[in-house]
Amino acid sequence: MLSPERLALPDYEYLAQRHVLTYMEDAVCQLLENREDISQYGIARFFTEYFNSVCQGTHILFREFSFVQATPHNRVSFLRAFWRCFRTVGKNGDLLTMKEYHCLLQLLCPDFPLELTQKAARIVLMDDAMDCLMSFSDFLFAFQIQFYYSEFLDSVAAIYEDLLSGKNPNTVIVPTSSSGQHRQRPALGEAGMLEGVEASLFYQCLENLCDRHKYSCPPPALVKEALSNVQRLTFYGFLMALSKHHGINQALGALPDKGDLMHDPAMDEELERLLAQVPGLVNSITASPEASCLPSRTPPRVGSPWRPLHHSRKVDGESDGSTEETDESET
């Protein structure tokens, strides 16, 4: 049944909004790359399986980063897959370094860029503590903001630097690789950086940016709410406020609330059902429950979407637990 939103938009606008052309092009490319295998099952079945995988969010597993970040749906799917695969890290209370979290990301996307992981870690950690340990929940919610709103945050970093230096904030921002978000955090002696910028003026600039930005932006009303209790703020203070804001997490729709981060009963039940079908596997999983949530360190490249998709997405095995705050102690 067609949704009211679908009926309210012209066909071409709806197709563009849902990035249907992106998925059609990818499906055709995979069809051509694997035509010999697909000929055994039929083209109709291939397209059915492909678009089922897109709806289920499993189509991004083990794909190249350019595809993983290509659409908002792909980004949400990747965030959800990362959470489901590695919830056991939070359940067990394990604290990992930035490099270790990056290794986990690369299990799902082999060419995932280190720079994005570093940016997410900077939201959580102090300026001189990039090698310190982080809890799963702290990293995950910071990573969600950094990954999903990446282009928007690059523009925000440029706006912040302009405000800090007294430039006109109404000029068009063209973010570059040298934008403020890529730089080291300021030293403690840099009073101007520590003081930050006026929150109300900063929000006005962000509101104008959201109006003209072609990439995904957090809802302006929620951004205003996140900044409502401060008079001045730093750039990383702003990112931290976004990552901790309940409403922004709900609006993005990729992750559950922090209190429910370790709960996914449907996935756990399905995993148990699948494991029961594999002779000799249940005992080993029972002896080492954390092993079931980690995909292979060298996952195969997905050549055809209909082959591994219905199994790759159900790879998690824990149910309940709690997270720890970021700590510098050794695990």
Curated annotation (Swiss-Prot):
The modification Phosphoserine is found at residue 319. The gene is CSTPP1. This is Centriolar satellite-associated tubulin polyglutamylase complex regulator 1. Residues 112-331 are annotated as: Required for interaction with TPGS2. Residues 289-331 are annotated as: Disordered. One of its GO terms (cellular component) is cytoplasm. Keywords: Cytoplasm, Cytoskeleton, Microtubule, Phosphoprotein. Residues 318-331 have a biased composition (Acidic residues). It comes from Macaca fascicularis. Belongs to the CSTPP1 family. Its main location: cytoplasm. Residues 1-111 are annotated as: Required for interaction with PCM1. Coiled coil: none annotated. Residues 1-225 are annotated as: Required for interaction with TPGS1, LRRC49, and TTLL1. The keyword Cytoplasm applies. Regulator of the tubulin polyglutamylase complex (TPGC) that controls cytoskeletal organization, nuclear shape, and cilium disassembly by balancing microtubule and actin assembly. Regulates the assembly and stability of the TPGC and thereby modulates polyglutamylation of the microtubule, which antagonizes MAP4 binding. It is found in: Cytoplasm, Cytoskeleton, Microtubule organizing center, Centrosome, Centriolar satellite; Cytoplasm, Cytoskeleton. Interacts with PCM1. Interacts with TTLL1, TPGS1, TPGS2 and LRRC49; the interactions link CSTPP1 to the complex TPGC. Binds to alpha-tubulin.
